[in-house]
Amino acid sequence: MRIRSVHPVTFIMLLACCLIGCDSAVFDDLSDCPQGVNFHFYSQTPCGQFPDYPSDIRQVRVFAFDEKDVLVSEFSDKKVVLSADYSLSVTLRHTGKLTFVAWGSRNLEAYDFSGFKEGVTTKQEMWVALRLKDRRVSSVPEPLYVGLASISLENREDMGSIYERVSFNMRELTYRVHFTIWPIPDPFPMDEEFVIRIEDDNGVYNFNGQIAFCERFEYVAEATRDTERILKADFTLMKLEEGRNTLISLVNKTTGEILYTANL
């Protein structure tokens, strides 16, 4: 068998060409690698030792704003099951500081989100509102959570596939309230119906979960009666604050008479 020799100079030149080609291929691969962020959601109070993962959050919407507070992108997931292992992985290529606003609920369709347009809408123009009908809402609107986070991203085109972790501590903006009303001195008539009405103007929120301007509206719930003729009703109310003149009334639905009114 004859073995053909290769001149050393020729071999070195071929090897150099291969290395140059590999460098080019690697660079092209890196520039095309997916990059983005992994969103994580939890809830933890300042005194809490461990994070909680609210089962009420089954849907999330995340809005990303640049260093000028202008909307650059939006991400969502309608099949959320929060846990320590859950994450919403999104592709995002951006250099500079980003601020994220996350909203969560069992059903975000219960809320009206202001119109958003990428490259135009600012963070200060964001608002989220309860969907009302004739200035009324169900006594148990869907729970609502909000969370804020930020991150600074460098140019990562030559770093391959990188996903930064962004975590949201989700604050609930809804309150569960239970009312029990004892009749004094006479029991409530069994043949009459009663409702509890709460009037407030806490149905609209800005990007950081603060109450924004809103017309007054009513939460209304039918009061149930137990064997001792005590009236009971359960409410889920939006964020409550002192000094907002939140009024609660007990109304005889049969006669239309307002039996009791107080500032909640």
Descriptions of predicted regions:
Residues 73-171:
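Short, low-hydrophobicity acidic/polar segments
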Residues 130-229:
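A sequence/structural signal for flexible, mid-protein segments enriched
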Residues 18-21:
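C-terminal motif of bacterial Sec signal peptides marking the signal peptidase cleavage site
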Residues 28-47, 170-182:
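A short, Gly/Thr-enriched small/hydrophobic beta-strand-prone motif that recurs across taxa
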Residues 60-114, 189-264:
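Tryptophan-paired
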Residues 23-26:
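Bacterial signal peptide processing site
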Residues 1-10:
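Bacterial N-terminal signal peptides that target proteins for export
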Residues 50-54:
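Short consensus segments that form the blades of beta-propeller domains
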